[in-house]
Amino acid sequence: MYRCSWKEYIFAVLFILGVFSANIGYHFMIAGEDLALIGFFMIPAGIIISFVSVLARIRIHDQAVPVTQLEGIRKGIVSSMGMLHLNLLSALLCANAAMTLLTGILVSKAIENYNWGSTLSFVVVVIIAVFLLQDQSMKAHDLKRLEKMQTESEKNVS
């Protein structure tokens, strides 16, 4: 079973801080002229921190899972399935942070009651979820094919 390392926890905390920074920056931009400049810099900083922490967490996870043998591939697929909901949550929050930036810049104050950023981030997350699920189903299909090849080679040997 795959366990998170302390590095992943640190990047998860950085990720939450990045998204929090981006959303607070958006509210600073709306609040007024004095805080708008601070908010303008907080939003991209939060988005960059969020994306870097997600990429680092995925990289740490991929290095921790062995994929050299069939058993390693099986463990990798199982742990990737476990990480799927975390990656979807990460994608949701990153998309929300990115759309917060677009909302703050493109949407005027007259229509700020409707949160366009949430709608767009939902669409982005659905697209990302479809790609992630397709990737997981392809890995599961490859695992079944590898197991079948292994059983056939064992039959041929004996």
Predicted regions: what is each one?
Residues 31-32, 76, 109-115, 150-157:
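Short, flexible coil/linker elements and helix-boundary hinge sites characteristic
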